[in-house]
């Protein structure tokens, strides 16, 4: 999709070059600047300019990117839209839906569903800004253009964990692929992984816990909580029991979007489904 941004330079930005304005003032990455140079357009007062061009108060700087998205097979799979504008689509990812197509899941992914959802929009681009495990529910942000893909995100996860978790804590234990396994991870080997958590409520031998991730390792919350002896309920891969639910009780319950250049500073929230909450009434009353 084509996306054009226009800015009128004020006195506080005078004598900046285009590169400095785009990087420092707008907060865009060097990759965006490169894309504007080779795949897009930079205009000052309607005339093409290089990134070293100096800006004066009253100048109009126009930035345009044109891109086409990868074609995915369309699949009519329902999902709830939590928020949408010209730059972002935030959906409520259902249980048992992978984000990307993969062997065995070539037509039931989020991207297949997004292709169906956007089929009447020419050249629609949808770029997931992070992954959620197939059985993790909650807010998933799709960027509609490269400008949006540069947004800063802050996510909050919520889980039902077995046992009585501490009031708060920080787990700083590396995570890596379990030897001999293709999917399962384990704690104690691999890359640095840091998880902060805060217990919201404890009742009936289970705890409702909020998480903020300082790193983004595969299965990070699941592995770290299993390491502490408090696996996520319903997560039988890492020791969670299925006696109360067959659904993994892990949700991305909030995401904050920040991109001043796109005029967005917004928190989008969701929660476990009513069906999931009904399995743990003592935690959700």
Stretch-by-stretch model annotation:
Residues 1-285:
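RNA pseudouridine synthases
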């Amino acid at each position: 999709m084509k996306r054009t941004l226009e800015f009128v330079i004020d006195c506080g930005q005078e004598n900046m070059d285009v590169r400095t304005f785009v990087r420092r003032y707008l907060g865009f990455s060097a990759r965006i600047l490169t894309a504007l140079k080779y795949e897009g357009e930079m205009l000052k007062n309607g005339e093409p300019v290089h990134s070293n061009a100096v800006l004066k108060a009253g100048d109009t700087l126009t930035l345009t990117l044109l891109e086409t998205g990868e074609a995915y097979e369309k699949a009519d799979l329902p999902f709830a839209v939590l928020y949408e504008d010209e730059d972002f689509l935030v959906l409520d990812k259902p249980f048992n839906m992978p984000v990307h197509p993969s062997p065995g899941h070539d037509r039931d992914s989020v991207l297949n569903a997004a292709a169906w959802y956007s089929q009447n929009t020419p050249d629609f681009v949808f770029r997931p800004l992070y992954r959620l495990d197939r059985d993790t529910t909650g807010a998933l942000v799709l960027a509609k253009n490269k400008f949006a893909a540069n947004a800063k995100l802050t996510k909050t996860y919520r889980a039902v964990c077995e046992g009585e978790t501490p009031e708060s804590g920080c787990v700083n234990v590396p995570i890596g692929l379990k030897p001999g396994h293709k999917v399962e991870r384990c704690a104690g080997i691999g890359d640095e992984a840091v998880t902060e958590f805060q217990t919201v409520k404890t009742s009936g031998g289970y705890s409702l816990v909020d998480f903020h991730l300082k790193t983004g390792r595969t299965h990070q919350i699941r592995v770290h909580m299993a390491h502490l002896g408090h696996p996520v309920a319903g997560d039988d891969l890492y020791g969670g029991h299925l006696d109360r639910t067959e659904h993994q009780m892990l949700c991305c319950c909030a995401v904050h979007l920040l991109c001043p250049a796109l005029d967005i500073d917004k928190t989008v929230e969701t929660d476990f489904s009513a069906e999931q909450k009904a399995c743990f009434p003592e935690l959700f009353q």
